[in-house]
């Protein structure tokens, strides 16, 4: 089965073709960073308009790279949610129209499920079951994954997501959008030991997260510091977030008895996080799995693969379609089971 994947949940337009026999044949991504930079964040209307401009050219591009034609596509998968409704509608409308025109099945997939399954596209994918940390600008979740659609949320953020905390802290430090990567760069020249920020909710049992208090502490520190202190503040903040994520993942491995840990989502590209998670996993005797850097952020490849996982079991949508801004991961069911 050859599946075209369409991702348009926020500010990146992603297209990809996944083949069950050949694997990932092609993927292409357009980031809207330049479009939103002057506003300091994503403007939903601008995001939707840019998806409209990009989705067809990117489709042509992946078809050319894969060396196939539209009639070679057996199914189309698209991101149904969660995300920005207008942006989701662009991808969903294109995908459903194309599927209808080709006479092939279509399926709307869950954005977070696609992130969870992204490491399956790597040469050494994790076997089920595993524990996954999904850490991005919009989500921070610890999930026990028994199989496709078989998820148990172990912990989640009670307020800001880790990526959101990175972006907001970067803004406090006067860094340009997108803030997360810029903060990581600044932190490289800083001393993380100069400031001691809290490791939120690590002093009590449980696997939930909270980053709003840490953000407030950083704000207070910035207000009392000089411009020359910014790198040290960035390094101390990054260290606090990474320590928190590592501690919670260690707890999750112990609580579940799992020997496999998956890190996915945009924050999973952070170098310090990868380094510290590797050290912790080695100490715990667990294998550590990431998607390649290009597949940490939103992309069409993970959508195409997730669509294939479900479509190959006979699941598909009817002609009516909807998108959803909010869609709890716990609402998903395994392929073949009623929703």
From Swiss-Prot:
Binding sites annotated in the UniProt record for substrate: 134-138, 167, 180, 270
InterPro entries: ATPase_NBD (IPR043129), Gcp-like_dom (IPR000905), KAE1/TsaD (IPR017861), Peptidase_M22_CS (IPR017860), TsaD (IPR022450)
GO MF entries: iron ion binding; N(6)-L-threonylcarbamoyladenine synthase activity
Record carries keyword tRNA processing: yes
Coiled coil: none
Enzyme class: transferase
GO CC, alphabetical: cytoplasm
Cofactor(s) for this UniProt protein: Fe(2+)
Record-listed Fe cation binding positions: 111, 115, 298
Pfam family, one: TsaD
Catalytic activity: L-threonylcarbamoyladenylate + adenosine(37) in tRNA = N(6)-L-threonylcarbamoyladenosine(37) in tRNA + AMP + H(+)
Co-factor: note: Binds 1 Fe(2+) ion per subunit.
GO biological process: tRNA threonylcarbamoyladenosine modification
EC number: 2.3.1.234
Keywords of this entry: Acyltransferase, Cytoplasm, Iron, Metal-binding, Transferase, tRNA processing
Record localization: Cytoplasm
Known role: Required for the formation of a threonylcarbamoyl group on adenosine at position 37 (t(6)A37) in tRNAs that read codons beginning with adenine. Is involved in the transfer of the threonylcarbamoyl moiety of threonylcarbamoyl-AMP (TC-AMP) to the N6 group of A37, together with TsaE and TsaB. TsaD likely plays a direct catalytic role in this reaction.
PANTHER family cross-referenced by the UniProt entry: TRNA N6-ADENOSINE THREONYLCARBAMOYLTRANSFERASE (PTHR11735), TRNA N6-ADENOSINE THREONYLCARBAMOYLTRANSFERASE, MITOCHONDRIAL (PTHR11735:SF6)
Protein family (similarity comment): Belongs to the KAE1 / TsaD family.
Name of the molecule in the record: tRNA N6-adenosine threonylcarbamoyltransferase
Protein source organism: Alkalilimnicola ehrlichii (strain ATCC BAA-1101 / DSM 17681 / MLHE-1)
């Amino acid at each position: 089965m050859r599946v075209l994947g369409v991702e348009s949940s926020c500010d990146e337009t992603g297209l990809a073709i996944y083949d069950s026999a050949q694997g990932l044949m092609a993927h292409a991504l357009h980031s809207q960073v330049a479009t939103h930079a002057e506003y300091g964040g994503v403007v939903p209307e601008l995001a939707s308009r840019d998806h409209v401009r990009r989705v067809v050219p990117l489709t042509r591009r992946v078809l050319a790279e894969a060396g196939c034609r539209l009639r070679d596509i057996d199914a189309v998968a698209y991101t149904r949610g969660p995300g920005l409704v207008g942006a989701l509608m662009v991808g969903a409308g294109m995908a459903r129209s194309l599927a209808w025109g080709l006479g092939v099945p279509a399926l709307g997939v869950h954005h977070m499920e696609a992130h969870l399954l992204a490491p399956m596209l790597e040469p050494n994918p994790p076997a089920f079951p595993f524990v996954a940390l999904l850490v991005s600008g919009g989500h921070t979740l610890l999930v026990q994954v028994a199989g496709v659609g078989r998820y148990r949320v172990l912990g989640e953020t009670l307020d800001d997501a880790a990526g959101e905390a990175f972006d907001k802290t970067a803004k406090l430090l006067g860094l340009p959008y997108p803030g997360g990567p810029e903060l990581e760069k600044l932190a490289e020249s800083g001393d993380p030991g100069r400031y001691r920020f809290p490791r939120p909710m690590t002093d009590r049992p449980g696997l939930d997260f909270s980053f709003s208090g840490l953000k407030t502490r950083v704000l207070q520190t910035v207000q009392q510091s000089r411009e020359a202190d910014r790198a040290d503040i960035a390094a101390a903040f990054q260290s606090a977030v990474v320590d928190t994520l590592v501690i919670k993942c260690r707890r999750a491995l112990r609580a579940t008895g799992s020997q496999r840990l998956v890190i996915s989502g945009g924050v999973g590209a952070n170098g310090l996080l990868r380094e510290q998670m590797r050290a912790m996993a080695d100490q715990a005797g667990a294998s550590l799995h990431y998607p390649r850097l290009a597949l940490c952020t939103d992309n069409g490849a993970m959508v195409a693969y997730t669509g294939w996982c479900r479509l190959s079991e006979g699941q598909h949508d009817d002609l009516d379609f909807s998108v959803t801004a909010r869609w709890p991961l716990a609402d998903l069911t395994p392929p073949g089971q009623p929703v």
